[in-house]
C-alpha cells in the first residue's frame, strides 16, 4: 500500500452506483476510502491494497470530519434514491442536510475536489425542454427531486461564498446489474405484475451504471471540472419503448395500455395511507404519478460528452444486464 497516493473518500459506496465507482477508482493511482455504516459492509467488496474503510454517516458530521481527515477528494453518492418513504423527512435529512454536512466537512478538512452526485429531477419541471446545466429549476413534483435540489444548492452556495471545490453531476435514470430497488420497475415487469402503463408516451433519459461510474471518476480526476455542473446521459426512450425493450429481451409480455395519471391519483392516495402504517412501499407512489404528470424530462448533455469525453452504452445493453442480474438472483 502506497501512502503517497491521494485518497478519495466515497460516501454511498455500498450502493448501486457506489460499487462500480469503487471498481473504477481502483484503476486509478489513488487510495480509496469507503464510508460505510457498519463493519459488515466490508464484505461487499473484494479486498484490495488501495482500498480501506471508515465507519460514518452523512447525518453525523463529526464522523465525516474523521473520515475526510487527510483526504484529497470526496465523492458524495449517499442519499435516499426513492419515490416513497414512510417518513418523508428522510428525503431532506439525507439528500439535503446530509449533503450539506458533506460539504461542510470538505471545507473543514481542506478537500481539494468534491463531486456531488445528483439527478436531473433536481431541475424539477423547467420552463422549457430540452434543458441544460444553466436552466433555472422549475417546481418539483417529488420529494426526491426537491431534496436533491436543496442539497445541490447548499453546495453551490458554499462554492460561491467559501470556495468549495465542487463539481455536480446529474445522472439520468441509471440502469444495470445490482439495482435492488424498485424505482426502475425492471423486476416488476419480469414478474408480469404490471396491468398497465403510466405516462406511456413520456420520454426520459437513461444511463448505464458503468457509464455513470466512468463519468464520476473522470469528473473527480480532472481539476478543470471544478466549479462546473454536468448533465450525464443520452439514451432516450418513452415509457412504452422502455418496457417494450424489456419484453423483447426477456421474452415476457408487458402492458401496452396506458392509464392517465388523473384516474390513478385516488387509488395512489389510498395505497400511500396503507403504506404509512405497514411500512411497505406502495406499488404506485404518488410522487411517481406527479413526476409522470409533468411530462417528458429531456436535457442536453452535450457539455459532459465534450468535456469529459463520454460515450454511452445503449439502453438495450443496459437493460439486458439488469434483466440477467434479476433473473439470476431469482434462481438463487
Can you describe what each PLM-predicted range is?
Residues 7-28:
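N-terminal Rossmann NAD(P)H-binding glycine-rich loop of SDR-like oxidoreductase domains
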Residues 40-41, 51-97, 105, 123:
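NAD(P)H-binding glycine-rich loop region in Rossmannoid oxidoreductase-like domains
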Residues 92-99, 115, 147-148, 205:
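Short alpha-helix in the Rossmann-fold core of NAD(P)-dependent oxidoreductases
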Residues 97-143:
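Conserved Rossmann-fold NAD(P)-dependent oxidoreductase catalytic core, especially the SDR/UDP-sugar
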Residues 125-169, 173-174, 195:
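Catalytic helix-loop patch of NAD(P)-dependent Rossmann-fold dehydrogenases
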Residues 165-204, 246:
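NAD(P)-dependent short-chain dehydrogenase/reductase
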Residues 180-184, 198-221, 227-228:
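Substrate-positioning beta->alpha
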Residues 218-283, 301, 306, 315-332:
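Mid/C-terminal beta-alpha module of Rossmann-like enzyme folds, strongest
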